[in-house]
C-alpha cells in the first residue's frame, strides 16, 4: 500500500508524496530482511514451515517500525485529506458501483472501497487468520460507490488494520519448531488456491506428478 500511495501521488501533482511513501516502505523492507535475508524476494515461507525462526528482539523492532508508521499515516491524513487540490482530483473521480465491481471481477481494496466487505482471509479462513480478530475494512464515497478518494482511504485504513493484525500474530506466535519433521509426498493431481494479496486475489495453480517436486 505504501508503494501504491507513493506511485499514485505524483500523478496528482504531489511529487513529494512519492518520497514519503518510499521512505516509509524502506522501514518494512529493512524489517523483512532480518529473518529472510532478502529485500524484495524473501523466499521465507516453505512447504512445511519457514526458512528460519524469528531472531530475538524481532517483535520489538517490528513494534517500533509500526509505531513510526502510525505517526506517519496521521501526517498523510492531515496532508492529503485536507488538501483542496488532492480532493478536487479524487472526489467523484473514477466512480463505479459495488455491483459494477463484482461484475467486473474487481477484488481486494478496490472492491472493498465500494463498500463490499469481502476479504479472502476471512472468507476462506486459511493459515492462522481464524485465530485473529479482525473484520474486512470497507469505505465508499457514498452508498456503494467507489471513487479515487475512497480507494485512497481504503488503503490508509487497511494499513492501520494490518498493523493490528501483525501485533496479534506476534503476540500469539507459538514456541517450537519452525519446520515439519517430514512432508508426505502427494499423489498425482492438481490444486488451485487463492489468497488475499495487497492488490486483490492472488491465484496459485499446482500440478503434482507423484514425486516431491511439482510438475508445474
Task: List each language-model region with its residue ranges.
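Active-site bordering "gate/hinge" segments
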Residues: 1-216
Amino acid at each position: 500500500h505504501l508503494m501504491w500511495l507513493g506511485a499514485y501521488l505524483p500523478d496528482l501533482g504531489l511529487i513529494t508524496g512519492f518520497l514519503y511513501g518510499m521512505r516509509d516502505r524502506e522501514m518494512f523492507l529493512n524489517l523483512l530482511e532480518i529473518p529472510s535475508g532478502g529485500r524484495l524476494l524473501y523466499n521465507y515461507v516453505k512447504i512445511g514451515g519457514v526458512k528460519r525462526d524469528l531472531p530475538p528482539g524481532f517483535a520489538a523492532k517490528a513494534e517500533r517500525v509500526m509505531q513510526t508508521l502510525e505517526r506517519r499515516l496521521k501526517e498523510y491524513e492531515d496532508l492529503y485529506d485536507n488538501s483542496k487540490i488532492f480532493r478536487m482530483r479524487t472526489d467523484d473521480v473514477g466512480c463505479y458501483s459495488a455491483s459494477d465491481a463484482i461484475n467486473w471481477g474487481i477484488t481486494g481494496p478496490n472492491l472493498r472501497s465500494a463498500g463490499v466487505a469481502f476479504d479472502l482471509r476471512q472468507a476462506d479462513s486459511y493459515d492462522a487468520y481464524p485465530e485473529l480478530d479482525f473484520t474486512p475494512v470497507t469505505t465508499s464515497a457514498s452508498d456503494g460507490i467507489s471513487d479515487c478518494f475512497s480507494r485512497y482511504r481504503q488503503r490508509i485504513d487497511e494499513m492501520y488494520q494490518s498493523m493490528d493484525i501483525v501485533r496479534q500474530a506476534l503476540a500469539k506466535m507459538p514456541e517450537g519448531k519452525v519446520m515439519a519433521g517430514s512432508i508426505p509426498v502427494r499423489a498425482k493431481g492438481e490444486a488451485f488456491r487463492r489468497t488475499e494479496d495487497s492488490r486483490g486475489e492472488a491465484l496459485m495453480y499446482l500440478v503434482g506428478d507423484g514425486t516431491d517436486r511439482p510438475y508445474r
